[in-house]
Amino acid sequence: MKGYTLTTKTKKNIRVLKLFLISLIFVLIAVSIAIIGCNYIGNRNFKETFYSVSSLKVNNKVRIIQISDLHNCSYGKDNIKLLDRVKKLKPDLIVYTGDIVDSKAKSNDRVISLCKELADVAPSYYIYGNNEVEMYYDIPLTQESLDKKFGFNDNNRQPDKLLEITDDLTRKLEATGVKVLKNKSDTITIGTTDVDIYGVLTSNPSSFWSYAGESFDEYMYSNENNLKITAIHEPLVFEEYSPDSWGDLMLAGHNHGGTVKIPMIGPLYTHDGGFLPDRGGHYV
């Protein structure tokens, strides 16, 4: 057996390598803590984004507040920060575009309380997101899954069968005065402006036209002088057709501006857009 003796130079190189690895580990830990901290703070503060949209169908100013992807979060005790800000803005209409609840939460009382308070501020509409669907439907709302559940095919499909499914969240929301739109529309008059709002339940591109197409066409092509607002959670179906296919104003959520966000860089990954997606921004 041969013995090996490390030279002084080799020992020095090993010490340098160990020091480098230890330093690298500390840097990675520090970066991870910074990212987690920034995301934690960001998830407990909301940022407002204002958009101005013009339409010849509007006779007076209409202020709409869109709230999306809260995931059962509270901004201050009993959501006081969010409530106070919404009240101060004095909206004419409030639209919740899904994932206000969190499928892992034990209770939706916080969401119901928020919606009840804001229903006294302005007429409110609620559209289901994937978290609501996960909680109250036993299948993903794709065409394949829905057809299999109901025994449908292209020749016998009855979209209204899906709408016959009721759930506790809808009952509680509507008891507060919030209207839940599931592949249906409603009309509201704000000042002298008539507004039609359509809420999409089957936002998956595979099931949108087969389960919402008939009611959506009726919404789009009746009362054409009314302002048309289409509200949806997952926006992918909007990319399937030209913007003028969806009405005068489109409201969506879901992407959060990135599932993981790096400070100063932005979204690292979204489950729809992959790594370093072009999509970004604040949706709440």
Q: Language model features by range: what are they?
A:
Residues 1-58:
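N-terminal membrane-anchoring alpha-helices
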Residues 45-76, 213-229:
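Mobile, glycine- and charge-enriched loop segments
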Residues 49-55, 184-191, 281-284:
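Short acidic-hydrophobic surface loop/beta-edge motif
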Residues 60-164, 168-171, 176-179:
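Membrane-embedded segments
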Residues 62, 93, 195, 227-229, ...:
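Structural motif
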Residues 68-72, 98-100, 130-133, 184-185, ...:
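Active-site metal-binding loops of divalent metal-dependent hydrolases
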Residues 139-140, 145-178, 184, 190-232, ...:
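Binuclear metal-dependent hydrolase catalytic cores centered on His/Asp/Glu-rich metal-binding motifs
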Residues 235-284:
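Conserved beta-sheet core of the metallophosphoesterase superfamily
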